[in-house]
Amino acid sequence: YVSATAGTKLSVPLITSADINAPHKQVTIQEIYDFMIKDVKEAIEQGLPEQSRTVIHPNLGAAYAFLARVYLQMANYEEALKYADMALEQNDTLYDWISYYNSHKEAITKEDSYPSLPSATGYDYVENYYFRCGEGNPNYATSELNIPVERAESFEGGDARFLSRWKLRTVNQDTYYQGLAKGYFNGAGLTTCEVYLIKAECLARQVTGNDFSAAMDVLNKVRKTRILPEIYQPLQASTLTEAIDLIRRTKDNELIFTIVPFADARRFNAEGTFARALSKTWEGQTYTLTPASHLWIMPFPAGAVQNPGNGTITQNVSK
């Protein structure tokens, strides 16, 4: 979302009918954002309950959390902060990952042992506003995905959440961090941790001097439930760049395997100030994804463009 072009650049076809033959229109980015916001606000007005029937049914906290996420993507930090606070009024609980790690420490630290631990982030995860499995299957338990060594290096030292979920392993010529957890994973839902980190960024964005303590207090509140006490030190920032970097590190790691780090990266790239190039070396060759690369954009399948049904679809990339 870029406000200067949102009213003219096309997004996706907006389909509001269950009729397979209903006509559709490819709307602008502004129109699709307006539709999402209007839809959620209407649901709130119509009486979304504070407590939903199940965690896979949205409740009031989920609606507020979703609006906070959407407004953050629009760089509307005032509204994002407003709805983040409203979501936290519904649920502000953070999971104690330090206690989880300590409960399973013996199994985790046992040499040459890669135990199957119960996922803490399933349907009953206390941070859930709304649960969706993401890449997992809602009908049966799945295993935590492995991560490469270079990805693991971005986690803070002493991160109990990381230590509880991955363990370094070498098999033949491959060294990687093996996923330990098995169960259900809220990979596409909404959680209190994300909302705290949205709030932290919004508070940082509103600073006019160099006092980022309010934003750092929110970030550190999350970290206190993650970083082992013998290693934990409160983070401080004296510039917006420092604050954003610290918040982004925690958020990228907390929401690994979700769409959020990707969406945030595109948002920061569009803004320019906090844009990053991503590089990876594979078999002696270094590949770099620049902030302006067309590869950040997911093109429509050729079949959809050529046969769009009862409407038209304009391709969103030129390459």
Protein language model regions, located:
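Extended, hydrophobic/aromatic-rich amphipathic alpha-helical segments that build helical scaffolds
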Residues: Y1-A4, Y33-I44, I56-L88, G187-K221, ...
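Flavin (FAD/FMN) cofactor-binding core of flavoprotein oxidoreductases
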Residues: K224-R226
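General structural signal for alpha-helix termini and helix-helix connectors
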Residues: P49, R205, L228-Y232
